[in-house]
UniProtKB/Swiss-Prot annotation:
Coiled coil: none annotated. It holds the Pfam family RRF. Keywords: Cytoplasm, Protein biosynthesis. The gene is frr. Belongs to the RRF family. InterPro entries: Ribosome_recyc_fac, Ribosome_recyc_fac_dom, RRF_sf. One of its GO terms (molecular function) is ribosomal large subunit binding. This is Ribosome-recycling factor. It is found in: Cytoplasm.
Amino acid sequence: MAITEPILKEAQERMKKAEAALQRELGNIRAGRANASLLNRISADYYGAQTPLNQMAAITVPEPRVLMVTPFDKSALKEIEKAILASDLGISPANDGSAIRLVIPQLTEERRKELAKDVKAEGERAKVAVRNVRRDAMEALKKGHKDGQFTDDQLHQLEDQAQKLTDQAGKDVDAIVADKEKEILEG
């Protein structure tokens, strides 16, 4: 649907940002498979500065449940290992002198259900964000109507468009959540 009203364009952009934030959050939830994004939030001390691992090392997935972290500078190996141990990943790094192997353990059924619940909670937070965007857009449209920018008919059309945007964003969030739940539960 082509949106011409700036208020609705802004609302659509904010809804897309809520979806992108949800995908980033869900990318950090471990699904029993190796994924380089698991290390996105981890930083290590590198010459006195906290540096993200993906800027200090090549992170590869040689096997479905193994992450390999190969530092560009071998002297940073110990610091990277310390950072991984200090993180909340719950994975013990194996240092072979030139790289670090991280074996992702299989998830228990109980843990899978827990993660699926976390995914649903993140999805719910994203939907709340989308609804807040709709509320802000509706308030701005009503203010525009009050100020004489829109006729009654235009206001109703724009409100319908805002609701359609909200419904679509809700469906998108549901699809993202369903995909992640499937990934977790199938392992």
